[in-house]
Curated annotation (Swiss-Prot):
GO terms for biological process: proton motive force-driven ATP synthesis. It comes from Corythaixoides concolor (Grey go-away-bird). Component of the ATP synthase complex composed at least of ATP5F1A/subunit alpha, ATP5F1B/subunit beta, ATP5MC1/subunit c (homooctomer), MT-ATP6/subunit a, MT-ATP8/subunit 8, ATP5ME/subunit e, ATP5MF/subunit f, ATP5MG/subunit g, ATP5MK/subunit k, ATP5MJ/subunit j, ATP5F1C/subunit gamma, ATP5F1D/subunit delta, ATP5F1E/subunit epsilon, ATP5PF/subunit F6, ATP5PB/subunit b, ATP5PD/subunit d, ATP5PO/subunit OSCP. Subunit 8, of the mitochondrial membrane ATP synthase complex (F(1)F(0) ATP synthase or Complex V) that produces ATP from ADP in the presence of a proton gradient across the membrane which is generated by electron transport complexes of the respiratory chain. ATP synthase complex consist of a soluble F(1) head domain - the catalytic core - and a membrane F(1) domain - the membrane proton channel. These two domains are linked by a central stalk rotating inside the F(1) region and a stationary peripheral stalk. Residues 35-55 are annotated as: Disordered. Its main location: mitochondrion. This is ATP synthase F(0) complex subunit 8. The keyword Transmembrane helix applies. Belongs to the ATPase protein 8 family. Signal peptide: none annotated. It is a single-pass membrane protein. Residues 41-55 have a biased composition (Low complexity). Pfam families: ATP-synt_8.
Amino acid sequence: MPQLNPNPWFYIMLMSWLTFSLIIQPKLLSFTSANPPSNKTSTTTRTLPWTWPWT
């Protein structure tokens, strides 16, 4: 069964992960986020239940 021979598949997997790790990932991490995280604490709004007119 040729698909169990790890010789070409391991090389392909290794090259694709190296390409991702060394080339693509630093380019993606250099972008600035559109919504940077803030230090503000989130406030919860109190919502009151609305009475339905037909009940």
